[in-house]
Amino acid sequence: MAREQDSINSHPLDKYIDENSANESEIIKSSSQFSHEDQQKIDKLSKQIKPMDNDGLLNYGTEAQSNMSQFSHRILNEVKTTDVGPVGDSLNGLMSKLKSVNPEELNPENQSKLKRIFKRTKASVNEIFSKMQSVGSQIDRISIELDKHKNNLKKDIDMLDELYDMNKDYFDELSIYIEAAKHKQYVLQQDEIPKLREQAKSTGNQMDVQAASDMEQFVDRLDKRIYDLQLSRQIAIQTAPQIRMIQNVNQALAEKIQSSILTSIPLWKNQMSIALTLMRQRNAVSAQKAVTDTTNDLLLKNSELLKQNALATATENERGVVDIETLKTTQKDIIETIEQTLQIQEHGRTKRKQAESELNELETELQNQLLDMKENK
């Protein structure tokens, strides 16, 4: 619907969604502020409503209602076909891989226990290195899948924008039909019916009495037709926030996926790289200490001095750059981010089911109204 220049960017449905406090009467009131172009359409449609033309009245606005019905079908199909299940599978896979590497395995104290029990510390360290490399490769593949899911969600968001604009167009079209019918109803009630009643009263002619009665019946049917169109418009009013609800859930999910790809995964890789570097440093220090101890055994005369130097060197080298507890906290934050994303997905799935149920009810109501129209005919 065209609007005046000072309100061209303000649509009743947008106001309804943004303010949340607007009720239906406020929306209908704002929609009555038609532009000059819309008023011309209203006048034209109003003149096309011919008194006593029951067939014409029956078909009045049916094209707009049919478009609204087809639009409701499309919305329902989009809700049914939009499947974010693979997104959840990918996120679950990512969480599983992140949890598969335990920072405690990089703790030197645990490595000492392994040495005492299995006598194979070197093999255990190599296994950890290999495991982390394998997990890193798998996370890269999951990252590619998540990026694809994010792009699909963005396409769905754009598609929902188009549907939202279409819904506004249907709302505007129905508002024009309703306004034109109300205008015609007012003219008949205030002008035509009083004239026919006066004529019947003055002439006493039964045909004139019947003509007045027929006109009153026509106005009553016109009022019912207006109500049917208002029901269709109500669908558009209720569909707008439902579209935005689905769209906002998809947007939040896409943002969480992007956060995982651009922040969580690189951070995990960096922290694991640091941990591996520290592990190698600790191994180098251990080797250095062993050489120093052997030298101390061979150089008895300088044993005390060498012992002091070796202990001082070992103490300095044993100091870690990054605490294991810090690494555990970082990984915990990453996992919490993924879990929040899964919660958003579950919330989105619930909202879509709710939207699907409501849309089915609205579609059934509209079909019942159309059937009633046909039966009344």
Swiss-Prot record:
One of the Pfam families matching this protein, by short name: TelA
Composition-biased stretches (Basic and acidic residues): 1-18
Residue span of region Disordered: 1-39
Compositionally biased spans, kind Polar residues: 20-34
Family, similarity comment: Belongs to the TelA family.
PANTHER family xref list: TELA-LIKE PROTEIN SAOUHSC_01408 (PTHR38432:SF1)
This protein's name: TelA-like protein SSP1345
